[in-house]
Amino acid sequence: MDARAINSREKADLKYPRNTYIIGDVQGCYRELQELLELIQFDSTKDRLGFVGDLVNRGPNSLEVLRFLKSLSSPLIVLGNHDLYLLILGYGLMPEDSYEHTLHAVLQAPDKLELLEWLRHCPLIRYEKSLSAVLVHAGLPPQWNIKESILHAEEISTALKGPHYLAFLKNLFGNEPSQWKEDLEGQDRLRYICNAFTRMRFCDAKGHLDLESEGKTNQAPSRFRPWFEWRNPQEDNVDIVFGHWAALNGQSSAPHTHALDTGCAWGYKLTAINLKTKERFSVPWQSALRM
């Protein structure tokens, strides 16, 4: 099922989809994405797709992934740190050779600006009330409830969609401030919010971020834990669906949290979850198809 198949159909009204499937970090693995859609028997006229960010980079086909997702009818998409990195590169705010990446085809594409425009209008959080679920790339820090998280994510959306988005993106990278304070202002405030939603793995009970550690949950530095171990599922009363942390291999120890990054771009698999039934589907990395 490719983008042409989607485009050839009349886009359906998906207000009441048959199924809603959320897919983990695609990271440019277009062929695996298509294999996964075949596995779940995705029907664009009846089903809805969602993605927990990191749509691009590391895998070989980021351009094809973006074009395909843009063709979908009302997909549920949140941004990840690699997607923000593409925006920074795409708008010329950082030299293309600053870091190793696989985004060259996107950066040279004739529809680059159209794709970037579409991407920066995607949010950092999606709350699906009908399914009692929140989509976010990295996670939700413990000091914010669901409502507060949504409001803070909207601050980033406002910056990305506003007239000064280039200045916001240019100064986005950095690990500080790592501690949330209500009186944070300007770029410091936005950087913390963005890091929490797109880069966080370990934090302390007050939302102090450790952005250096990337290992398994038992490798947390002193006083830090995986963000989901601090949250109160009774207070949240929703399912939190996230990606970003490939070392978890799709496993989360906390109730009502669903980890979907199963390391496809690292040679493992791409995973989807049916939000209604919680059934999971996975396809392996197609190494034989790599160029």
UniProtKB/Swiss-Prot annotation:
GO molecular function, one term: bis(5'-nucleosyl)-tetraphosphatase (symmetrical) activity
Protein origin, superkingdom: Bacteria
Gene: apaH
Record-given protein name: Bis(5'-nucleosyl)-tetraphosphatase, symmetrical
InterPro entries, per database record: ApaH, Calcineurin-like_PHP_ApaH, Metallo-depent_PP-like
UniProt entry keywords in alphabetical sequence: Hydrolase
Signal peptide as annotated in the record: none
Family statement drawn from the similarity comment of this UniProt entry: Belongs to the Ap4A hydrolase family.
EC number(s) reported in the record: 3.6.1.41
Organism the protein comes from: Coxiella burnetii (strain CbuG_Q212) (Coxiella burnetii (strain Q212))
Cysteine pairings via disulfide bonds: none
Function: Hydrolyzes diadenosine 5',5'''-P1,P4-tetraphosphate to yield ADP.
Record Pfam families: Metallophos
Reactions performed catalytically: P(1),P(4)-bis(5'-adenosyl) tetraphosphate + H2O = 2 ADP + 2 H(+)
